[in-house]
Regions:
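Aromatic- and glycine-enriched beta-alpha-beta binding-site module
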Residues: 49-97
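Extended hydrophobic/Leu-rich segments
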Residues: 3, 10-13, 17, 24, ...
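Exposed alpha-helical structural elements
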Residues: 6-12, 76, 91, 113, ...
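Short N-terminal edge-element motif at the start of the domain
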Residues: 2-63, 68
Length: 207
């Protein structure tokens, strides 16, 4: 059975923590709140994450070296439930109220996604006029991709309208987009920390 991209990236995130020897410390575990400190066993802040779970509200607050995030389910949930829900990456992202950049954008991947759109629109890549336009477009496109996405104008948007139509922008927000490694690290860290604390008898299956 082929491993999905999300599973592969979660395994990589887990290995990143294992390599650094991360250890979970239970800071608080009251009727409502569970606070977990997840950091290297030597106490350094490299890849440090702090997790706060509000079980009554069903919210997860993440802070630390890997960025910040607030995710909310709006109904009571245990720590184990939330850790399990987060394994579904896009479901977890859908619960974000705010977060450090959750997506990365890459100009090479953006070009690949646009090429796929052009092929679906039946564009003839052998046409000499198109080839000239396409070469110029690929040279210019990296100027319009940054940490926040793909924001074309000028000749780049003119190219897209010419070959994809005036509704080319529909769905363009996903071009070149991938989930940031920090999201996989947040998920893997919470799962590993909860497992460690449960195995140590510091969290029960009901927590």
């Amino acid at each position: 059975m082929k491993m999905t991209e999300d599973v592969r990236k979660l395994i990589e995130a887990k290995h990143a923590f294992e390599k650094r020897g991360h250890k979970a410390t239970l800071i608080q575990n009251s009727d409502r709140y569970t606070i977990i400190d997840w950091r290297r066993s030597d106490g350094s802040g490299d890849y440090y994450v702090n997790y706060i779970v509000d079980r009554k509200r069903g919210s997860l607050i993440i802070s630390g070296d890997l960025g910040d995030c607030i995710a909310t389910w709006y109904n009571p949930n245990s720590v184990h439930d939330i850790a399990q829900y987060c394994i579904s990456v896009y479901y977890f992202i859908s619960k974000f109220q705010c977060a450090s950049d959750k997506y990365d954008y890459d100009d090479i991947e953006t070009i690949a996604d646009i090429r796929e759109e052009l092929e679906e629109h039946g564009v003839n890549f052998s046409d000499m006029d198109f080839q000239e336009d396409w070469e110029y477009f690929q040279d210019e496109l990296p100027n319009y991709v940054n940490a926040h996405g793909f924001s074309p104008n000028g000749s780049v948007s003119d190219f897209l309208e010419k070959y994809l139509g005036d509704d080319w922008w529909d769905g363009s927000d996903t071009w070149g987009r991938s989930v940031s490694p920090r999201v996989y690290l947040w998920i893997a860290g919470l799962s590993m920390a909860v497992d460690q604390l449960t195995e140590a008898g510091l969290l029960s299956e009901e927590d």
